[in-house]
Curated annotation (Swiss-Prot):
The encoding gene: pgk
Residues that coordinate or bind substrate: 21-23, 36, 59-62, 118, 151
Source organism per UniProt: Borrelia duttonii (strain Ly)
Keyword line: ATP-binding, Cytoplasm, Glycolysis, Kinase, Nucleotide-binding, Transferase
Protein name: Phosphoglycerate kinase
Keyword set includes Transmembrane: no
Amino acid sequence: MSIRTIKDCDFSGKRALVRCDFNVPLREGNITDDTRIKAALPTIEYLKSQGARVVLMSHLGRPKGEKNLRYSLMPIARRLSELLGQNVKMLSDCIGDEVVTAVSCMQNGDVVLLENVRFYKEEEENSDAFAMQLSKSGDIFVNDAFGTAHRAHASTSGVASYLPAVGGFLMEREDEFLGKILKNPESPFVSIIGGSKVSSKIAVLESLLPKSNVMVIGGGMAYTFLKVEGYSIGKSLLENEYIDVASSFLKKAKELSVEVILPIDHVVASEFQEYSMPEYVDSVNIPDSKIGMDIGEKTLKKIEGVLSSAKTVIWNGPLGVFEFDSFAKGTAKVAEYVANCPGITVVGGGDSVAAVNKFNLSGKITHVSTGGGASLEYLEGKVLPGIKVLEV
């Protein structure tokens, strides 16, 4: 099902109430990464060019439903002013008479930013009354916050009960690429799923399995699958309660003729510490006293081989403990292989996106998703409230 987008509306002289995801990292009031702010610019610039009066809203952090200036959007207003080359007026609230009055004084092409919507507990409660108050600042609701699309909050889905709702360019792009992965991936389709726990990734594994030709399983969760296959995993992470789940998953993969690639060699350590000495194990089996920390050279060669001919690739989750430099090589190499793959490549989920950015490869990926939990839930096949309200 497709979504309505900003191209479907006439915005001239209209108030566009835009939900963005400006939940950016701050240090002492300074923005340390403005990626999410820059991601919203195409939608904002387009609305300005169409003569809209652009009213932006977002959350920042977890202020727990109370006004807390530590979580004010003021630094975002300053950065937006720099990026847009015009004054972005920061309002002191997100609802109320003063906000409605300030918005009514806007000229076409003006941009204002409402204060943090999570200063009200009613935001996360998806309060109908709060959604109605927010809607008073707009004529058309534009949701461009894919990162919060999995949340049924007042500013992400509730407002759509009171205003016509469309998706911004960022939302449209996320829906297009992640939707293609789920509905119509071109073969050969390779899924690379990493991360530490089977429990947090089993839903996405099961969702992608019937569509995949090859599935690479790495990261900490791979050791539970290796244990099921009868291999020694030493002191590596093991989820005993997911042994049966992993076993039935591997059986289903065989029935569907999906090739599952698990690590065939490892980089290990004696302790799970950043400065532990890395050791190479040229075997599927890990010695009893060692912990698996990363995939080895032979596993990487195998992954490189399947990616060289892939037409579609989805990557979610790191293949090793990439936050420790000594155990980051596997994830770095896979990022490189995905970037060099000739097919459509999609990277989704916070950690794998962080890895792609860390190794400066995002420019070579077809689509790098901006949503962490939202990407994961989309790939699990769940209905996202923030997208559902935009569906045609």
